[in-house]
Amino acid sequence: MADQKKPLQGGATLPLMAMAALGVVFGDIGTSPLYTLSACLSAMSLQPTAVNLQGILSLIFWTLVLVVSVKYAWVIMRASNQGEGGAMALTALASHATGHSNRLRWWILSIGLLGAALFYGDGVITPAISVLSAIEGMEVASPAWKPLVIPLALGVIIGLFMVQRRGTAAISHLFGPSMLVWFLLLFGSGLTWIVADPQVLIALNPWYALQFFGIHGIGGLVILGAVVLAVTGAEALYADMGHFGARPIRMAWYFLVLPALALNYLGQGALLELDPSAIQNPFFMLFPAWATIPMVVISGIATVIASQSVISGAYSATRQALLLGYLPRQAIIHTSASERGQIYLPLLNWLLMVAVIVVILWFRSSNALSFAYGTAVTGTMLMTTILVFFVARHSWKWSLWKAGLFCGFFVLLDGVFFGANLLKFVEGGWFPLAIGLAVFTTMSTWRWGRGILASKLYPDTLSVEDFLSSVTPGDPIRVPGTAVYLTMREKAIPHALLHNLKHNKVLHERVVILTIKFEEEPRVLPANRVVVLDYGQGVRRLTARYGFMEHPDIPEILKSAENSDNLWNPLDTTYFVSRQRVIPTAKASLSLWREHLFAIMLRISANATDFFRLPPNLVMELGDVVEFSHKVPDAPKKEKTTQQ
């Protein structure tokens, strides 16, 4: 149950790593004070009376404590998959923990995919609501700025996505110090107003949270849909664990972020108790009038950093999903020579940009967007809690009552938050759910489609031994050089090899059948990377294993498999790859529209040449046309994921 701690890189001290984590992990949750309290009051059209404020502030504070401090920082961050966290890492852990039950694995996989899919709904709304809420601060300085809010927000968003291709390596070292300044401002501004009205501190008593529901009855549950805005971004504590390790993240949360957030929310409450007219924008009115524009600039920087963290998280999650075989291959561009984690996915970048622009133009204000925010976040939290139950039972060896008590409490809590957000479905809660459903459908369609495609391509597997038994010294003709054939199946003869033999009547002197397998773990030790099987007659099979945080290097694989009899010369090597095209039919187990969706995804999938970064002048691509008419079982057996 102990954490697998990531060593502090470059001799960095724990406080320095904690400060670096501020710029990556806490941007989303750190900018929540911009809009959370306003959203809570507008959710039920409440007046900022002392009783209402005490109840809301108590709910916000104890939500931060229970959801972030207890659930994520104390427990879920223990679910380390070789030091990595996140939806895919947790799904892999839960799947491994359950043993050999194929049906249970299938359900765990579905829950994990749904949780990962809902993350994209959050990823679209976070940049929109964060940037809008920061720029809306200009209205506090002068209402004349109001017509410029939308154009300025769109300009910031478009600029943010346009620079992604260049990467953030040059300025990322400034993110941590910038967010440190932000949290110190949250701390100081909140404390100033608490000193002016210390009575607000009674909201730390959980009794006032319960009293709120006593006053407002069952209708008071609506407020939870806005209260949860205070913990948006909590998943980042776990998702970014692989970058910094658990200790620096916990240190930053307990010693700076939590106190700063709590004091700022309490400070906003104190301000509203003393001046109810500040309901217009309680965050920016914490500061004197002369500081409004500087705070708009500073909050703008903080929200851009928060948005950048979400975008980078989307890149990372998508990369993991496509390497594990849940999404079509896409171009992955590394934007930093020194930081392997700094990547850029062009297609995803433009899809996200268009989606965020649509959100801003549709909702037009952070207050309206608050109705859309929350459904995806709470849905992801609920899926995470369910997966942690299996990890706690089978990996941590918790007793049934202990795992059931902990996870049961948080399933109930997450379920109440999720239900409260569903009450906002018509006002905008449908939007992130629609995005999550679309992503889940895409992932599941690709996964099932690949299974059907593999069963059609390899219905009767021809083994290498059977193939070689038909090869004689003069037939077929052996030509000089090395042929590398990429294939999905470990034991099958690649289609490209059979096509080449059928049409060209030749076989290379050296034949390498290469299968690349992506394991459900972040990394594979180099010693366990490549398995070589020599069949004789110049034919060898190489099976290379990679984790979902790694990218294959085919030349390195071939070089590692060298021996005195098989020296690899990259200049006399030809790479043979296959590319499939499917013909949808009504006979397949997928519905016809999903078959067409799979066919489209297959067409836009990056080819093996680009994905594996093979030299184009040394690649020969052969095609297969496949009719979809194969039935697959309801709960397919688990297979190692390959992407050839």
From Swiss-Prot:
Keywords: Cell inner membrane, Cell membrane, Ion transport, Membrane, Potassium, Potassium transport, Symport, Transmembrane, Transmembrane helix, Transport. Coiled coil: none annotated. GO terms for molecular function: potassium ion transmembrane transporter activity; symporter activity. It is a multi-pass membrane protein. The keyword Membrane applies. It is found in: Cell inner membrane. InterPro entries: K+_transporter, K_trans_C, K_trans_N, Kup. The chain crosses the membrane at residues 10-30, 56-76, 106-126, 143-163, 175-195, 212-232, 252-272, 282-302, 343-363, 371-391, 403-423, 425-445. Its main location: membrane. Pfam families: K_trans, K_trans_C. Belongs to the HAK/KUP transporter (TC 2.A.72) family. This is Probable potassium transport system protein Kup. It comes from Acidithiobacillus ferrooxidans (strain ATCC 23270 / DSM 14882 / CIP 104768 / NCIMB 8455).
